[in-house]
């Protein structure tokens, strides 16, 4: 992290401020964990609010302070007042205003100082202070460094729990290539603050309702392979969602199952979103297979080398056909 930027932010935070913390739309554990950790760190000296563009999964409601999150979609009037009064806005775990969806306009029009802290590639230039490092395992690891620089003595169990959750989620429990020796060191330091590692694992992974278990079975059964390419993909249709009483977060982690097959380098999940008239796409990979480039080029998306997302405005059948053609072309261009 740039010490000059950190010193400037530290100076701004030396007096009481009205602060908003914003995760990306449909926040995951890293985004929400980062926001909640910073919320706990700042709340005693500042007026702090977390505004999420939309609702987050029930799975993450075990995180300390999650009940304080304001959801813009359902609490617009309250949120608008906070935006009007804000002096500082932190955008966490995203580097393009489009990732904030319905809140992006409020950020761009605000007179508040905007501070970006994020670990994705190719950040947009929208923030007054930009802390960006795509080599970091997670935004939560970056927030640990940020808090430790400002005042490490304030790190308590609540902060540690939120950060540890974000780190283990984004590193696949410390198994993804983004995990470094320093990531493990930060995890160790957080455990020293009383983090209940077993409790977090249980909440993140052993949380299936019976309907979700059946949906997983359907998703696995739907996996297809394209010829002899090292690619698997699967679909969750609107009908699948209705029959399983689908809730936000129910498909979390499903795409990873494709990578457990020997010889497979890329796994893709298509989720039909009829209400939004689009297909949500999750890409995962390993080795040299760069799904962020593929997602950006063909499906208006992006992300990390081994984890990315995208969307399609075509119907599910046409999206599947487009994907098959595109992935063949991509592999021919980049890997032949």
Residue ranges and their predicted role:
Residues 33, 62-64, 103, 126-129, ...:
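Short acidic, glycine/serine/threonine-rich loops at helix termini
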Residues 38-39, 106-109, 132-133, 185:
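Glycine-rich, phosphate-binding/catalytic loops in enzymes
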């Amino acid at each position: 992290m740039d010490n000059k930027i950190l010193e400037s932010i530290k100076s701004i935070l030396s007096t009481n401020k009205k602060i908003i913390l914003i995760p990306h739309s449909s926040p995951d554990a890293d985004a929400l964990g980062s926001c909640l950790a910073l919320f706990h760190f700042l709340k005693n000296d500042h007026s702090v609010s977390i505004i999420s563009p939309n609702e987050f999964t029930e799975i993450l409601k075990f995180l300390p302070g999650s009940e304080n999150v304001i959801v813009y979609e359902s609490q617009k009037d309250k949120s608008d007042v906070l935006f009007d009064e804000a002096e500082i806005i932190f955008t966490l775990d995203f580097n393009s205003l489009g990732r904030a969806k319905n809140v992006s306009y409020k950020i761009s029009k605000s007179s508040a100082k905007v501070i970006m802290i994020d670990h994705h590639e190719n950040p947009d230039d929208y923030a007054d202070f930009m802390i960006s490092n795509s080599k970091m395992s997670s935004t939560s690891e970056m927030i640990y460094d940020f808090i430790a620089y400002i005042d490490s003595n304030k790190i308590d169990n609540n902060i540690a729990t939120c950060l540890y959750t974000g780190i283990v989620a984004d590193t696949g429990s410390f198994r993804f290539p983004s995990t470094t020796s320093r990531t493990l060191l930060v995890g160790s330091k957080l455990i020293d603050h009383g983090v209940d590692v077993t409790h977090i694992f249980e909440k993140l992974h052993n949380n299936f309702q019976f309907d979700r278990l059946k949906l997983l079975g359907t998703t696995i059964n739907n996996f297809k392979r394209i010829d002899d390419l090292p690619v698997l993909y699967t679909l969750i249709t609107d009908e699948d969602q209705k029959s399983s009483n689908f809730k936000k977060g129910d498909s979390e982690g499903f795409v990873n199952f494709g990578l457990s097959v020997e010889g497979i380098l890329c796994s893709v999940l298509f989720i039909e979103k009829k209400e939004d008239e689009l297909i949500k796409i999750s890409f995962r990979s390993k080795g040299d297979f760069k799904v962020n480039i593929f997602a950006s080029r063909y499906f208006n998306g992006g992300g990390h080398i081994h984890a990315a997302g995208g969307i399609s405005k075509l119907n599910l059948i046409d999206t599947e056909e487009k994907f098959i053609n595109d992935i063949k072309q991509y592999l021919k261009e980049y890997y032949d």
